[in-house]
Design a protein with these regions (language model features):
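Short, aromatic- and glycine-rich surface loops/edge beta-strands on solvent-exposed regions
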Residues: 1-3, 7, 16, 137-138, ...
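Short aromatic-acidic-glycine turn motif
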Residues: 95-119
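Short, surface-exposed glycine/acidic/tryptophan-bearing loops
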Residues: 427-449
Length: 508
């Protein structure tokens, strides 16, 4: 039965008569409606849209994902038209079945208001064909709404209506319910469809092959032939590139995150209680989304900073082999602690147990902490630069999820290959031989041969809110801006105590 969009944004059935209108030579038509990512090329001059649906599969690591977008992500809704320049269109989004909410009523989602540059809850979204305000960059004092004038190919999109939105409700409780329902579905996805109609309720044709105008709404993304739009569950982080100007860095013009005091936040996150996977997305200086990695997340008992011991205490419940490939050898498991022995020998001038093989006790903190298993290597090209690292002589390849997001930001700002990490923490949150790495909130990196490169890397760690950067006192004494210098860091840079409060939590 034909439908229309009412004033509240709900879709309702039309009463007869609803006969077709005889078209003239200027058939007014909505040809296609689809969700998309923004794709910017030519050093920020050209903008295009990349469709995301079941007919245009998304990939991670060369493999198709079972979904087209993630619950909570920012996407664009693109409405392609013919002979409808400057006309206004209403659009609503609703579930294709009962999976997401238990019904198929129109969803209230977070619509991007170009004037305020904030996301606002909206059921019915109204947009004008040929208006590009959804593409605006971050506003300035002189121009609070931003601008899209830097795009030189907007004429290519003059017959499109463009909406920017986040695929989430305004309330955390509703988000959790939707996530639970998606997790319970056989496909672990929920399908969304779009209903569109002229705001003035005048006749319109729908679909690329339509030859008649009808006075009703059109439905898109509601069949396999059109493509389904499938939403899945993930925790995710969005990491925004900074713009280099000489030796300094400023916020990118497409970073819309809120301020943290006088500094704009550079990372946002959305935690999804129905997923144990965390996906990291980088946004370059033009606003392009770049997939970095998906990591498995666990929750383990947190550990206090390690304490050196002269011997392993009696009374261990059991012993276990430590992960091979690093200095740790044996874990001695106690009721409220893990004592690790290994091959690391203290310096002869160390204050505690000089020259001895190190024995470290990590007591339980009493609170679980989240950890992600980092990729063994990373090498992602971004505009002639790279986000890259490898590990060296360590199996400490687990990290606090927030800290890993910040590390990706550091690498994006540094922009060169050759960064080797000597580790974060193990999967049990201990960090042998380090005393100060439990819970994966610190990053160790080998010193780079090039002095300027090492200084740039250190500066990036400081810029990305690592509050305890420690450099050595011998060959590295020339490094500037470290928070502390210590002899036990003569062979590696320690970047720790990442400030998680610097991250924008979408539901806080």
């Amino acid at each position: 039965m034909p439908i229309t969009i009412d004033d509240t944004g709900q879709t309702v059935t039309l009463n007869p008569p609803y006969s077709p209108v005889t078209p003239d030579d200027s058939l007014q038509k909505i040809t296609r409606v689809y969700f998309a990512k923004k794709t910017v090329t030519q050093q920020g001059a050209n903008v295009a849209f990349t469709r995301i649906d079941s007919l245009h599969a998304q990939q991670e690591g060369g493999q198709n994902t079972p979904f087209d977008s993630v619950l909570g992500k920012t996407v664009y809704l693109v409405i392609e038209t013919e002979n409808m320049a400057t006309l206004s269109i209403d659009a609503v989004i609703r579930p294709s079945d009962n999976t997401l909410t238990g019904n198929t009523e129109t969803l209230s989602l977070m619509w991007f208001n170009p004037e305020t540059q904030n996301f606002e809850v909206r059921r019915k979204m109204t947009v004008v064909v040929g208006n590009f305000d959804a593409l605006n960059n971050k506003g300035t004092t002189e121009n609070p709404s931003g601008t899209h004038d830097h795009y030189t190919n907007l004429a290519d999109h003059e017959n499109k209506a463009i909406i920017k939105l986040q695929l989430r409700p305004s309330l955390r409780t509703d988000f959790n319910t939707w996530a639970t329902n998606i997790a319970a579905a056989a496909t672990h996805t929920a399908n969304l469809e779009v209903v569109v109609e002229r705001t003035d309720n005048e006749p319109c044709a729908y679909g690329p092959d339509s030859t008649e105008e009808v006075k009703e709404a059109g439905i898109f993304l509601n069949s396999d032939a059109q493509g389904r739009f499938r939403v899945g569950n993930r925790n995710f982080y969005e990491i925004y590139a900074r713009v280099q100007s000489g030796t300094t860095y400023t916020d990118g013009t497409y970073n819309f995150l809120p301020m943290n005091g006088t500094v704009r936040r550079k990372i946002s996150k959305l935690e999804n209680p129905s997923s144990t996977q965390v996906t990291y997305y980088h946004y370059d200086i033009y606003g392009n989304e770049i997939f970095i990695a998906t990591c498995n997340k666990t929750s383990v008992m947190g550990r206090n900073n390690g304490q050196q011991l002269g011997a392993v205490p009696q009374g261990a419940l059991r012993t276990e082999n430590a992960p091979a490939g690093g200095a740790a050898q044996t874990n001695h498991i106690f009721a409220n602690a893990i004592v690790t022995t290994g091959t690391h020998r203290n310096d002869r001038n160390a204050r505690a147990f000089p020259g001895a093989l190190r024995i470290v006790r990590y007591t339980a903190s009493g609170t679980n902490v989240p950890l992600v298993r980092m990729p063994d290597t990373l090498n992602v090209a971004v505009n002639g630069r790279v986000i890259a690292y490898g590990f060296s002589n360590t199996q400490r390849r687990f990290c606090n999820p927030d800290c890993f997001a910040a590390f990706v930001g550091v690498l994006s700002q540094y922009g060169l290959a050759g960064v080797n990490s000597t580790g974060m923490c193990f999967g049990d949150a201990t960090s042998y031989p380090s005393l100060a790495h439990p819970n994966g909130d610190s990053v160790d990196t080998s010193y780079l041969a090039n002095r300027q490169n090492e200084q740039n890397l250190l500066n990036a760690f400081v810029d990305w809110n690592f509050a305890q950067v420690i450099a050595g006192t011998t060959q590295q004494a020339w490094l500037r801006n470290a928070h502390r210098y210590a002899t036990d860091h003569n062979d590696h840079l320690h970047s720790g105590d990442f400030d998680g409060n610097s991250i924008h939590n979408i539901y806080q």
